[in-house]
Amino acid sequence: GLFTRQEKETPAPEITSEPVTVYPGDKNGLPYDVVVERLHIDEPEPTPPEPAPSAERPDHQENTEQPRRTGQNFRITDDHLGEGGPRLKYQANITAIRLLKELEAAGQQASPEQQEVLSRYVGWGGLSDAFDPEKPAWASEYAQLKELLTPEEYAAARSSTLNAHYTSPMVIKAIYDAVGRMGFETGNILEPSMGVGNFFGMLPEKMRNSRLYGVELDPVSGRIAKQLYPKADITVGGFETTDRRDFFDLAIGNVPFGQYQVNDKAYNKLNFNIHNYFFAKALNQVRPGGVVAFVTSRYTMDAKDSTVRRYLAQRAELLGAIRLPNDAFKKNAGAEVVS
């Protein structure tokens, strides 16, 4: 398939799929049968990652003005971005947060070299030990986080350890490949749970005339995303705080999943868990004929209650379903999930 054109020559992964499950429509509250395929990604031999560039350190003078968004959107060219052990990820996060706060204090927009540093922030999925005062091996990291983050930032970071599944470049490429096969080329693109914006960073060349809109609840991730993608319209807040009905041509991303709900007055009556809420709202945000391409929990299809599936089927046509490998998020988010 066609993938993001990269600045460096790197071997392209082999992406194939095979049917693994069939959900009969008459047993699942659907007007049609659903065939789920399993995605196989055969990665080329990895090349050693380049060391992170040193960040230019701006002056520390206080400046309450917002940074001028005059930079260029960042482009991800590292297929192994976000991989590594817990200590490596922790240090990359800390380095990115320190740089973010320096840029904000100086009222500056990140340079391309600084964007490289910020892009290595992977969030706190799989790093719960750093927030646990009862873990002696992580005592210094615990103290460092308490000192570096505001109470609001700390609370958001700690809560994200359970549901922050940052998406690997390989999975993002496969999703864009599928969207491209559907005929999408350019338009208004929404990423409603963007993290630091890896889907924006891997936008294929043929889609680069699109207008980008992102939403991110976590304050640190959202502010890093603004530094990485200054030409995008990014809201740092919950998806429930935004509403652009019938505006987007494509909604894409890796939505949160879990057994809890979002307080959105327009959707509370549905009583949907968070991952299904994102589907329901996104369908209203895209225009008729638009596409929603999300990574979601397998329970969207596997749940015994067919209410969600019937709701979605009444409002949209399912174009395809892919089951990702169990370890699709292991290298980046430190988690094994079925999605």
Can you name each region flagged by the protein language model?
Residues 57-63, 67-228:
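Class I S-adenosyl-L-methionine
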